[in-house]
């Protein structure tokens, strides 16, 4: 394969703008799926949580061949919480395809990845997707994208970007606008040809000393650690002697490559050699980490290490100490939790883990609430049992002054909900930056708000907008501390003893607040069973039964009516709790509890 026949592109899109569907179409139309093969939808989101939530978490690769050119496609996460994945994915490509919904326009998460791509000097190709939607406004999207690039400091060359109109779900693309309701182009060839024309081919020299930077890691029980990266120059072959270096100042560690694999469709195919521009997987080296350079032992040419954004949120992961501990989980000890977190660090670069002074409690720092709850959800599905504390933001000290992370929030809401949302964001120390009505009864609000103010806001936002609002946020900068933000408005109902919940007890508590539990659920002293209708905590008896006597009551007894409980998901629990509370996570249940279970312990701690 000559060098000119390779193109490496990344696809950038906001959640639900149709990126994964678009990749499905590119794979189909390039003939990657043979006629007899079963075509799976959303091939790129192959992790169980990704399929359920419809979000991309891990940066993944696939490759298609179009008119003799090998195109490597790198799928990037659209969410700022996975910034670590985004930066590494972009280090492997020469151009980016920015996919934007023809109705919604550019969103904050798109902005995050686009800013990174433009800063690296990558040239964008704009794809306006879903142009067949009834509310599509392609002209608005193209202008909004131009303004966005300009704001993010794009060069004149980057601002002269090609535009492709497409409908990913129907499998067509076009370079010119057509009539609404009609098909504007025959197939995806317009997009393929634009990529070949505008993405520069790799310029590396195959005869130069090898230079391969590892951008992602994988693990296989058969061959051990697998490194994924793009060859900048030189040629790599199986059984070749190399050195591994952590940047120009790193110490060279000798090693030997075992296998070299390249991407073909979604498959990994063994290769006898690979040259500049190819994205390869290699194994046989145990000392590889993210950002290291694999280079020639005689004339090493290491690249600088990849820079990843610092974490902004921290949580404590603790051993589960509740009376129900060990009943539902397979892995419950602090050693098992610690080992699992160390394993996660091998490929989750934006994560930090450290031990605390207290035994069985580890401090885990990440890029945001979603980043950490996805890790918890993965651990829970693997059979882990633990408790976690309320998330806290990571503060910085600048010139002796306390600084905190500020987020940029975009809320798309109906005009009737505008007052309530603005009041709630104001209470959380948010500053309104921009307000833009779309002329169709909806309005877009842009706020700058402390990251602390967003913890627990998602649930409140959904209630305020009756589920019709869209909100997304992105880290902006560190600024001086903005002062105290009020906590939760309601207190909680706390169980006074252990046992099973009875319908009779719930009936008596119905007017006290909303419940998290249902009849026959096990409870223990100190467990949170509901939200109190007032602002104080209340200890209640959720296990009481009706006293039976030998008197018969005239008339039929009234049936007990109870309100259905609030479903407590992992995200809801983490957002809901206060500093003196924990979320207990097991493979089967999510429970909320007080940190100190008995009332006497709570009083002592509160002094």
Predicted regions and their residues:
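Canonical P-loop GTPase G-domain recognition
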Residues: 123, 133-196
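A short, contiguous, amphipathic alpha-helix enriched in charged residues
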Residues: 322-345, 559, 563
